[in-house]
Structures are given as structure tokens and as C-alpha cells.
Amino acid sequence: MTSVTMRQMLEAGVHFGHQTRYWNPKMAPFIFGARSNIHIINLEKTLPLFNDAMKYLEQVAANRGKILFVGTKKTMRKVIEEEARRCGMPYVNHRWLGGMLTNFKTIKASIARMKDLQAMRDDGRLNRFSKKEALGMMRELEKLVCNVGGIGDMDRLPDVMFIIDTGYEKNAVSEARKLGIPVVGVVDTNNSPVGIDYVIPGNDDSIRAVQLYAQSAATAILRGKASGVDFGAVADEFVEMEPETEQGATGETLGG
């Protein structure tokens, strides 16, 4: 399991919440106190919840589940993309389009259009059009890549969503709840933990904190993928063996 220490959380500023006047009373159980009108999050509450969330992501990945990373604030766009790509998961890091999940059929059409334009660009078919038409298509492609590029290989709805700043991404949370998709979410002191399946009480503005969350999630997912057994591949190995070899291998396994 991903191992993060209290010291790492402190160094990343996970404990710094928002100004006390903006607090959400439902976050009271996770608040240690206040300093200079800034709420301080109780990391003794955060750390075990964080570990539970990472363990859950690891288990989902071990079962070949799809985990959608969501973080569209400018400060976190780069790290969301980097870490989602590192663990081979889809991501949304620019703008959450309305109906991205609840109207996934339409989103899939946009993904198909993006791939068509990419193919036309790569094989030279765009050169058959006038410069004006080709420029228009390239602009369309840029917009599509920005909006759906991170979910280009997501052929079905995700099994879980990993969201940093559930308040800012309230539309994503809402769609997940409508569809019954579990949410692992970083919730700061100004937002509500209600409706979040795995709450991570923590700073959602500090880039170091965001890096800690995203890197830990990606690492947990990679560990889960590595631990997952590909039963199909195992079955294929036995099918391809000669009868006497299969018997020997089976006997060796049982004996070992």
C-alpha cells in the first residue's frame, strides 16, 4: 500500500484549510482548530482516511477498474495529466463538460471526431482541403484535445472517480452521484463531505499537497495493477502446454 507519513503531509501543507469565515460546518469533525483566521485540518483524522482511500484505489486497479482523475484548476492541470498518464488512467484537467458522464454517448461521438481529425492530420489527408478549411479543422482538433483528450481511450464509464477539490468540481461529483459511481475526493474546510464515498480532508489549493495526492493515487493504482492476476493469460498458458508438461507444471505448483 502507498505509504505517506504525517511529516510528508505537514511539509506539503495538507493541514492548511480556508479562512474560518468560509468554513462548512459539516467539516467540523476534521478540523483541529484555527490559526490567524485559517482553519487547521486535523491530520490525525486525514492520514487514516487517506490511507483507506489509497487502499481502495489499489483494490479497484487490481480488479482492472477504470479510475477517472479530475482536477481542472489551472494550478493542478499539469500534475493531474502527468500522474494519470503515469498509471494509465483517464483524466479531465481542463473543463468538465456538462453530461460528460450522464450523456456519455455524445461525449464518445466527440472522442471519435477527435480521433478522425488526428488521423487526417497524421496521414496527410488535411492537405486535400483549402488552407482555411484545414486551419478550421486544426482549431477544432485543439479544442477537442483540450476537452476530451484525457478520456480518449475511455470506452466506458469509469468505475471510480478521484477528484481534487470536490467543491470546484461539483458538477463532476453530481454526475457521479446520479450514476452511482464512487468518488474518492479531497475535501477542504469550505466544502461539504456529504456524498463523497472516500473523504480526504485536506488542502486543495497547495500545489505540493495536490502533487502528494495525485502521486500517491497513481502509485497505489500501479501497485494494484501489478498485483492483479490476469486469469485469461494464465488459462492460455495451460492450454498451450503439452499434456505431460502441463501435468509436471501442475504437480510442481501443488507440491511447492
UniProtKB/Swiss-Prot annotation:
Family matches, as InterPro entries: Ribosomal_uS2, Ribosomal_uS2_bac/mit/plastid, Ribosomal_uS2_CS, Ribosomal_uS2_flav_dom_sf
Top-rank taxon, per record: Bacteria
UniProt keyword Nuclease present: no
Assigned GO CC terms: cytosolic small ribosomal subunit
Coiled coil: none
HAMAP family: Ribosomal_uS2_B (MF_00291_B)
Name of the featured protein: Small ribosomal subunit protein uS2
Gene source species: Methylococcus capsulatus (strain ATCC 33009 / NCIMB 11132 / Bath)
